[in-house]
Amino acid sequence: MARINYSINADPENTSKAMGSELHISPKKSREVCCKIKGMKASEARKFLEDVIAMKQAVPFKRHSEGAGHRKGPMAGGRYPVSASKEILKVLKNAESNAEYKGLEPANMYIIHAAIQRGRVIHGFMPRARGRASPKDTETVNIEMILSEVR
């Protein structure tokens, strides 16, 4: 596993960071979720992600929206990326606990940075008929999140 650094430099006095490495989720879906929660308060983002997991609220898909139907709310096409939301919620909880450890107040913090990078591809094969095999690759994602007390 390669060493991954944060893509922005943040002030360590009033920020907390968290990172998830090589998570087995879709890069496209996780990008859309991160774009939606960026700029939210940490408590709002946690509630939003829990609603997505419960399939009560859709995530608007702006870039990868082909085939996504119209959903209720201010969006054209949207989906319910449950597995990506679960992993991003884990990273958010980790960032909140890091803030609490540093003596910051997690309830008053905003997500100033939520980004993904594609991780390594885990190559695999699926056996097929007549002795053949088809490739079955698993994509991974690296998620980085930074919370700050000031916007």
Curated annotation (Swiss-Prot):
Region described as Disordered: 1-23
PANTHER family: 60S RIBOSOMAL PROTEIN L17 (PTHR11593:SF10)
Keyword annotations of the record: Ribonucleoprotein, Ribosomal protein, RNA-binding, rRNA-binding
UniProt-listed Pfam families: Ribosomal_L22
Signal peptide: none
Biased composition (Polar residues): 1-18
S-S bonds: none
Name assigned to this protein: Large ribosomal subunit protein uL22
Described purpose of this protein according to its UniProt entry: This protein binds specifically to 23S rRNA. It makes multiple contacts with different domains of the 23S rRNA in the assembled 50S subunit and ribosome. The globular domain of the protein is located near the polypeptide exit tunnel on the outside of the subunit, while an extended beta-hairpin is found that lines the wall of the exit tunnel in the center of the 70S ribosome.
Gene name per UniProt: rpl22
GO annotation, biological process: cytoplasmic translation
Subunit-level organization: Part of the 50S ribosomal subunit.
Transmembrane segments annotated in the record for this chain: none
Family stated for the protein in its record: Belongs to the universal ribosomal protein uL22 family.
MF GO annotations: rRNA binding; structural constituent of ribosome
GO CC annotation, single: cytosolic large ribosomal subunit
